[in-house]
Amino acid sequence: MFNLRTLVTLEALIAFAICQDMGILNYQNQNYEAAEKYYNSILSTDSDNSEAHFGKGSSLFMQDDIKNAEIKFNESLASSETLLKSKAFYNLGNISYKNKKLNDALQFYKKALELNPNDDEARYNYEFIKYQKDPEEKKDDEKKD
């Protein structure tokens, strides 16, 4: 089953965020508001910190603040870290899927896979949505006939 809540990951953030362990700890303990506040404190002094934008986006997503999570994931794309960008694209794919924008979701998962071909979750989601779209496209074709 395609479960967005379990698919939003902080793997990339964990890899980059030795100094941000309080945000990760709060996130892992499902204390998303505290994690968000922690990332806000980082961003108040370092507004270009892509890892903090990503962490805040993940925290916002888990609080169902999808619109602001999307903004933060887009801001984290400024990172030079390939793995972080891949995870940001992955999470933007999750948001697009949640918003029923399947074509956008496919494009985001594709970008995630281009940056990280070993991302099995992105590959699974990409294939899952392609499979979902195929019956829809066949119905549209039948309506035209």
Give names to the regions the model predicted.
Residues S41, D46-N49, T82-L84, N118:
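Short coil loop/turn residues that delineate tetratricopeptide repeat
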Residues I18-T45, M62:
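Alpha-helical segment of the N-proximal tetratricopeptide repeat
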Residues F16-C19, D48-H53, L84-K87:
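Generic helix N-cap/helix-start motif at coil->alpha-helix transitions
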Residues M1-V8:
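Bacterial N-terminal signal peptides that target proteins for export
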Residues F2, N31-S41, N68-L77:
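Repeat-mediated protein-protein interaction surfaces in helical alpha-solenoids
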Residues V8-A15:
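Bacterial N-terminal signal peptides
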Residues S58, Q63-D145:
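Feature detects intrinsically disordered, low-complexity acidic/polar segments
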